[in-house]
Structure formats: structure tokens, C-alpha cells
From Swiss-Prot:
GO terms for molecular function: ADP binding; ATP binding. Keywords: ATP-binding, Coiled coil, Leucine-rich repeat, Nucleotide-binding, Plant defense, Repeat. Disulfide bonds: none annotated. The LRR repeats probably act as specificity determinant of pathogen recognition. Belongs to the disease resistance NB-LRR family. This is Probable disease resistance protein At1g12290. It comes from Arabidopsis thaliana (Mouse-ear cress).
């Protein structure tokens, strides 16, 4: 009996449920017309709400604000529902015609039910979006980093007071432009650097801080280039714009921002409007600060109350000197502290001199050495009046204490470059080797190592400073006062000014007048506007001639080279309009170093092949060059650079290169499969290979690129190739590196590749760029790498990924990345939703890691290993929209 009751209850419930379902379906069909009308009206209201909101957002963004994330999400949902509504509305007529029985029934109940249900659900979604579309705030101040923290010397003494004074003055509402003036070496740049770094640490509403080094050679296009790089104007299209067009772009961008512009080392008035800098006002809150040696420059910039940066007082000077010398040296003899005070006093409170002399004296632990320093400083102080003139001889004491004549000569050589120039280390060492300062006859690797040791010595002596690392190249700089001292020494303390003629960055239109060419040993005319070089100067002692970066230069007469029998180094690089060389270059019988890179020379003169002592020949990026046939006549060549040439590299040319028995360094570009095969089969050339570019090899010619072990290979570029895989020719154990010196790899336009697992065998890789390769799915393939017990990318500093639509993985597990500074994910990398990071990654690199992305939604899609990883690295993510 109980069972019957149970069945009756179950049947009742079932009937009720079926009834409700039928009524709901009937409701969807019966109310299609009414719901469609309501949906249409609701969509119109939603669009109006969206348009009003967008106007508010646009106004806020023009004022330099950034739209709230909830605004982005809401607008995205509106865009989606609008698209769905359009699809729904497109079938409206058909669906209404399907209804019958006065709209109560349908000729196809299932289709009408589905359509009616979609209308009903969409109406609810639209009403919900309308209710959530009211925002009290639509934007907030931009959250991206305002500037880059700049390195400072660890020892800064005596600037605390003036720093606070300068900061308060700059931040005062009445201050628009602040000028800092003082003699060279007094600490103006250090003070401006501290101001820059304080902006980076202070939440004061400033959106962007821009640092530009101007120097004596004021060039508008260079300043615009630096500013453009800071604010995201990069790429070929922008670089090709005129100065006026760039000024408009910069003005339009900065007019919407609260910016701070810091100009270091200006020598004359800077026309801010020509650059595109808006006038700072109380309304826009923008600021400009600059440093200069001359008070008159401050007045020309409209600053009539500049701040003078003065030499340190006696107590601060002594404190700085003590810190540089160190307690161990000062306590090595009871008389040394008293003598050391006299040496510090001779530095006249100039921080640069205190730093340089302090470094020099740090290893002097006998009273005799300290007495000698006092004698030198007091003697010069008596002979010179002005502080600047007195400082140069005192700085010379550090030069005199350099360990050898070769180190001294290498130091003086650095003064040939323009003021504030970044000097590429390896290029400088190549000069030194060819000049004979370093013995490079036996072992190039050992000679380069000695060059780096000399650079280290000069940096430790504070005579050079580290200039940083850019594009995989390391640089040094020379302080302008130290450079003045070096030029003073090179001219035999100004007794023979024509010994070393340096007119770098002087905007010369012609070769300078020289009283006596016969005594000139070195001449630097870098970065001028010289158009033609004529005449036949008699230069029996000239060994070095720098003519690079004279972009107006079109002609050099043959007579010019006739009387330079001892010329060893000739640099003609970056003379982009120079289309030929005279045959009389053969007269340069002592020439060892010749650089013609980035010139427009089409044919090498026959006379060049007579330069039997030539060791270093750089022909890179000579896009007009037709041939280098006959290069094997230059039997003494050790370095040949042939990257980025448009000429066809033939097998016969490779055979000529093989005949160069002294060849040690080769950079080369390959654009044919036969030449590539010839190159990789040549043990001699592979052994010398330092940089290689492989371009435009189609899939049929090279399906699989097999690379041998190349111990000295540093850079690889593979572009526009159709190979399906890159593999390693294995002759050693699986874990040994095939490319121990490979540091930079660029892969672009290789649409057959699916992974780059071969990079496992490049343990010192620092830069990896992968662009526009449509089939790459993994950087390191888990399947291929499963048998290799190698942790990749331990030295990687920069990882740039662009236009890789199929990329899903960099590596399947988190990696330590102890050196990683930047990850850049741009343009169509939508399937890459996870980075190989965890909370322990980048411990050494610390908070320096920057993750840049170009897709506004990527930051929301990215998956993190865990909450700790997300908290650690999410603040590092920055939206950067730019072209490659």
C-alpha cells in the first residue's frame, strides 16, 4: 500500500515538472515580439550609455589619465553583446514569420523556442549591463614607472644639503625650469642623478621622467631620438620623419602628460620648442632641470636664479677622500693621515679629483709615496692659478701612477672620442691591438683579454667609468674633465698642441687648418659635417686618423693619402654618402686597421689589395658593395667583417677566405644553400666564425639546418628561411655546450620552425629575439629536451617574442632566470598564457625584471604558477604598444 502512495506522489511531481517546462517553452514563444521590442529599446539605451562613458574616458585620457580596468571590462562586454544582438536581429524577420496562431504557436516549435529563449536571456544581460554602467570614476593616474633609476657611485659625500635645496626649489609651484651650474667635476651630474632617482621613488603625480645627455655637440635629432625612445616612439617609420614632424609627435604626447625633463651638460641655449617640449606651467605641473658649466647658459634658458654647485668644504672633502682611500691604508702608518689631509686639500674640494686621487692613493702604504703626492700637488698648485687649471696636474698624478706605458697610452687613446661618447669596449681593444699597444701577433683571444684587463685597471683608477651594456655590447665613458686632462697630456702639457688634434663633434665643414702637419701623430675628426677632403698634407708621424660619422662626406682626393707612410688606423665608418675611395689608398703601406662599414662605397679600389700589413677589415652594412673579390691578396688579415651585405656571397669568395692563413675572426652573411654548405664544411672558417647571418633559404634547399659546434660563435641571425628544424651535429656528450660563447640569437620570418630546442646548447645566451614565425609552438620542446639534463637560459637577460600566433610555451617548468631583466611579449602571441616563472625566479635580478606586453588583454589571460608568483611579478607587467 505504501508503494502505491509513493508511485502516486512521484507521478504528481513528474506531471508538475513537465507542466512547468511546457509553460516556460510556451512563454518564450508567445513573448518573442514583446521581448524583441524590449531588447531593441534596451540596446539603444545601452549604446547611449556606452557613448557617454567613452566621451568621459576620452576626456580623462587626454588629460593624461588611464582608464580603470573595470571600464575596460564593461566596454568589452558591451562590444560582445552588441555583436551577439546584431546576429540575433539579422534572423528577426525569418523567426517572426515562423510564428502562427496569432503568435501563440509556431511552425517549428524547437527553433522558435531556441530563438525566444536567446532573446529573453539577452534582454536580461543587457539590463544587467545597463545597471552596472554607472561609474563615479572612469580613470586614474597612469601607473607605469615614471622613469629609470640611474646608477650612482656608492661614495657620495657632502651633497645632502644642496640636494634637499635643489629638490625643494624644483618642486616649488613657482619653479618651471631649474638650472644647476658649476665647474666640471664638481658633481652636477651626480646631483641631477639623485633628483632623477628620487622621482622614481616618489609618488608625486609625475607620469614620466626623461633623462637626456646633451653635451657640447647639441643636435636636435639626437635629443629627439633619446626622448622618442623614452616615450615609445621607435621604429623605422618614426626615425625617417623630419625634425619638425618629430617635434609635433613629441609635443602631442607630452602635452597630455605631467613630465619632468632632465638635461645633463648643456653648453648653450636649447630650443625646447624645436625639440617638441611643451612649456612647463603651473597648470600642467611639468618641470625642466638642466646642468651646465656656465651661469650665462642659465640666463639664456630663462633661469635668472640658478643654483651654483660648489666644491666641497674642507670637512666634506676630507670625509670623501678618507672613504676612497680606506681605513686600512690610512692606518698603515701614524703619519699618513696628516699627509693625506694635505693631498686632499690639494684637490680643492673637487669631488672628481678627490675620487680619482683617492683611488690612486688607496694602495700607497708608505710615507715616501704620500710625500711624493704632496710634492707633486703643491708644485703644480704654485704654477697654476684657476682651480680648473690646478686640478688637471693633480689628476695627472693618477695617470703617472698607472702601471705601465702601454696602459697610459691606452688611456690617452680614449680622449680621441667625442665628449660624453659611449666607447664600445671591443672596438677600442681592436684599435689598441692594431696600434701595437697590445701584442696581438700570437693569440687574439689573449690580446682581447689583456685589453679587458687594461679597461678594468682604468675603471678602478676612476679614469674611465662603466657606460653600461646596450644591444649586447659593453661600453665605457670618460668624464669630460678627465678627457681634458688626457688631451692636455697628449699635447705634451700644451707645449705641442698639434701632436694630437681632436676636433670631434665640432661641426666642421672642412679639415681644420694645421700649423705643422709634420708633428701630428693622431687626428680625430669624428662626427663633423665635412663634405670633401682635398690637399696633400705631409704627415710622416700620423698613425691614427678618425674620420667616422661625417655623414656629409662625399669625396676624398687621392692626394690626401700620399704622405702618410706610418698611418696604422683609418676609420671611415658611418660616412653614409661616401661612394668611393681613391686608388692612392695603396700608399698607406703601414695600414693595419680599415673600417668602411655603413658607407655607400660600391667598388673597393684596386689599391686596397696592396695593403699587405692590413690586419682588420670591416665592410659590414655596405649595402652598395658589389664585390670583395681578391681579398686573399691581403694575406695578413686576422679580422674580416662581412655582415649585412647585399652582394651574393659566392663559393669562390669562401675559398678566398679559406686561403687567409692568419684569419681569426669572421663575420659573414649567407643567402644561398650552397654557400652555407661550403661554410659549415670548412673547419678553418667555422673555427673563426664570430657572427653569422643566414637569410632567405627556402624550404626545398634546406629542410633541416644542421649546425656544428662553433666555439667562438657569438651572434646568430636567421631570417626569412623555410627550414623545418635546426639540429646540432653531435660529436660530444649530450650535456656539453656546442656554443659556449653564443650570446645573441635573432630568429625572424622562419615559418617552418616549431621550436628552438637547439638553444639548450648555448649556456651563455643573453639576448633571444624571436619574431614573426607563425608555426613556432615552443621555444624549448619538452619532447626533444626530455633526455637532456640541462637547465636553459641561466645567463639570459632579454627575451623578446613578437608575432608568434602558435607559441604556447617557452619552457614547461619554472626556470631560475638569475640574470633576466626583461621579457617582451608583443603582437599576436595570444596562445602564450603562462611564463616559466615561480616565486623563486629572478632572485638575483630581483625587482629589476620588466615584463612588457602589447596586447591589452594579455595581462588578464596570463596564468601564474601560484599566488606568490602572481604577487611577485604582476607589478612588473607594463603595457607597451610599439612597432618593432
Amino acid at each position: 500500500m505504501g508503494g502505491c502512495v509513493s508511485v502516486q506522489v512521484s507521478c504528481d511531481q513528474l506531471l508538475n515538472h513537465l507542466g512547468r517546462c511546457f509553460c516556460r517553452k510556451l512563454y518564450y514563444i508567445q513573448n518573442i515580439k514583446e521581448n524583441l521590442t524590449s531588447l531593441e529599446e534596451a540596446m539603444e539605451d545601452l549604446k547611449a550609455l556606452r557613448d557617454d562613458l567613452l566621451r568621459k574616458v576620452q576626456t580623462a585620457e587626454e588629460g593624461g589619465l588611464q582608464r580603470l580596468h573595470q571600464i575596460k571590462v564593461w566596454l568589452k562586454r558591451v562590444k560582445t553583446i552588441e555583436s551577439q544582438f546584431n546576429d540575433l536581429d539579422s534572423s528577426r524577420t525569418v523567426e517572426l514569420q515562423r510564428l502562427c496562431c496569432c503568435g501563440v504557436g509556431s511552425r517549428n516549435l524547437r527553433l522558435s523556442y531556441d530563438y525566444g529563449r536567446r532573446v529573453f536571456l539577452m534582454l536580461n544581460i543587457v539590463e544587467d549591463l545597463k545597471s552596472k554602467g554607472i561609474f563615479e570614476e572612469v580613470a586614474h593616474p597612469a601607473t607605469r614607472a615614471v622613469g629609470e633609476e640611474r646608477p650612482l657611485q656608492p661614495t657620495i659625500v657632502g651633497q645632502e644639503t644642496i640636494l634637499e635645496k635643489a629638490w625643494d626649489h624644483l618642486m616649488d609651484d613657482g619653479t618651471k625650469i631649474m638650472g644647476l651650474y658649476g665647474m666640471g667635476g664638481v658633481g652636477k651630474t651626480t646631483l641631477l642623478t639623485q633628483i632623477n632617482n628620487r622621482f622614481c621613488d616618489t609618488d608625486d603625480g609625475v607620469e614620466i621622467v626623461i633623462w637626456v645627455v646633451v653635451s657640447g655637440d647639441l643636435q636636435i635629432h639626437k635629443i629627439q631620438k633619446e626622448i622618442g625612445e623614452k616615450i615609445g616612439f621607435i621604429g623605422v617609420e618614426w626615425n625617417q620623419k623630419s625634425e619638425n614632424q618629430k617635434a609635433v609627435d613629441i609635443l602631442n604626447f607630452l602635452s597630455k602628460k605631467r613630465f619632468v625633463l632632465l638635461l645633463d651638460d648643456i653648453w648653450k641655449r636649447v630650443e625646447l620648442t624645436e625639440i617638441g617640449i611643451p612649456n612647463p606651467t603651473s597648470e600642467n605641473g611639468c618641470k625642466i632641470a638642466f646642468t651646465t658649466r656656465c651661469q650665462s647658459v642659465c640666463a639664456s634658458m630663462g633661469v635668472h636664479d640658478p643654483m651654483e654647485v660648489r666644491c666641497l668644504g674642507a670637512d666634506d672633502a676630507w670625509d670623501l677622500f678618507k672613504k676612497k682611500v680606506g681605513d686600512i691604508t690610512l692606518s698603515s702608518h701614524p703619519d699618513i693621515p696628516e699627509i693625506a689631509r694635505k693631498v686632499a686639500q690639494a684637490c680643492c674640494g673637487l669631488p672628481l679629483a678627490l675620487n680619482v686621487i683617492g683611488e690612486t692613493m688607496a694602495c700607497k702604504k708608505t710615507t715616501q709615496e704620500w710625500d711624493r703626492a704632496v710634492d707633486v700637488s703643491t708644485t703644480y698648485a704654485a704654477n697654476f692659478g684657476a682651480v680648473k687649471e690646478r686640478i688637471l696636474p693633480i689628476l695627472k698624478y693618477s695617470y703617472d701612477n698607472l702601471e705601465s706605458e702601454s696602459v697610459k697610452t691606452c688611456f690617452l687613446y680614449c680622449s680621441l672620442f667625442p665628449e660624453d661618447d659611449l666607447i664600445e669596449k671591443e672596438r677600442l681593444i681592436d684599435y689598441w691591438i692594431c696600434e701595437g699597444f697590445i701584442d696581438g701577433d700570437e693569440n687574439k683571444k689573449g690580446a682581447v683579454g689583456e685589453g679587458y684587463e687594461i679597461l678594468g685597471t682604468l675603471v678602478c683608477a676612476s679614469l674611465l667609468v662603466e657606460g653600461g651594456k646596450f644591444n649586447n655590447k659593453s661600453y665605457v665613458k670618460m668624464h669630460d674633465v678627465v678627457r681634458e686632462m688626457a688631451l692636455w697630456i697628449a699635447s705634451d702639457l700644451r707645449k705641442h698642441k698639434d701632436n694630437c688634434i681632436v676636433r670631434a663633434g665640432f661641426r666642421l665643414n672642412e679639415i681644420p687648418k694645421v700649423k705643422d702637419w709634420k708633428v701630428v701623430s693622431r687626428m680625430s675628426l669624428v662626427n663633423n659635417r665635412i663634405k670633401e677632403i682635398h690637399g696633400s698634407p705631409e704627415c710622416p708621424k700620423l698613425t691614427t686618423l678618425f674620420l667616422q660619422d661625417n655623414r656629409h662626406l662625399v669625396n676624398i682626393s687621392g692626394e690626401f693619402f700620399r704622405s702618410m707612410p706610418r698611418l696604422v688606423v683609418l676609420d671611415l665608418s658611418w660616412n653614409v654618402n661616401l661612394s668611393g675611395l681613391p686608388d692612392q689608398i695603396s700608399e698607406l703601406v703601414s695600414l693595419r686597421y680599415l673600417d668602411l662599414s655603413y658607407s655607400s662605397i660600391g667598388r673597393l679600389p684596386v689599391g686596397l689589395l696592396k695593403l699587405k700589413k692590413l690586419m682588420h677589415l670591416n665592410l659590414e652594412s655596405m649595402l652598395c658593395l658589389e664585390s670583395v673579390s681578391g681579398i686573399d691578396h691581403l694575406s695578413n688579415l686576422k679580422t674580416v667583417r662581412l655582415l649585412n651585405l647585399r652582394m651574393w656571397l659566392t663559393i669562390s669568395l669562401l675559398e678566398e677566405l679559406e686561403r687567409l692563413e692568419n684569419l681569426e675572426v669572421l663575420t659573414i652573411e649567407i643567402i644561398s644553400s650552397s654557400a652555407l654548405e661550403q661554410l659549415l664544411c670548412s673547419h678553418r672558417l667555422v673555427r673563426c666564425l664570430q657572427k653569422v647571418s643566414v637569410k632567405y633559404l627556402d624550404e626545398e634547399s634546406v629542410r633541416i639546418l644542421t649546425l656544428p659546434s662553433i666555439g667562438d660563435l657569438r651572434e646568430v641571425f636567421i631570417g626569412g628561411c623555410g627550414m623545418r628544424d635546426i639540429i646540432i651535429e653531435r660529436n660530444t656528450s649530450l650535456t656539453s655546450p656546442c656554443f659556449p660563447n653564443l650570446s645573441k640569437v635573432l630568429i625572424t620570418g622562419c615559418n617552418g620552425l616549431k621550436d628552438l630546442t637547439w638553444l639548450l646548447f648555448a649556456p651563455n645566451l643573453t639576448h633571444l629575439n624571436v619574431w614573426n614565425s607563425r608555426q613556432i609552438e615552443e621555444i624549448i620542446s619538452q619532447e626533444k629536451a626530455s633526455t637532456a639534463d640541462i637547465v636553459p637560459f641561466r645567463k639570459l637577460e632579454y627575451l623578446h617574442l613578437w608575432d608568434l600566433p602558435e607559441l604556447k610555451s617557452i619552457y614547461w617548468n619554472p626556470l631560475p632566470f638569475p640574470c633576466l631583466n626583461q621579457i617582451n611579449v608583443q603582437n599576436k602571441c595570444r596562445k602564450l598564457t603562462k611564463l616559466p616563472l615561480d616565486s623563486q625566479s629572478c632572485i638575483v635580478a630581483g625587482e629589476e625584471l620588466v615584463i612588457q606586453y602589447g596586447d591589452e588583454e594579455w595581462k588578464e589571460r596570463v596564468e601564474w604558477e601560484d599566488k606568490a608568483t602572481r604577487l611577485r611579478f604582476l607589478p612588473s607587467c607594463k603595457l607597451v604598444l610599439c612597432n618593432r
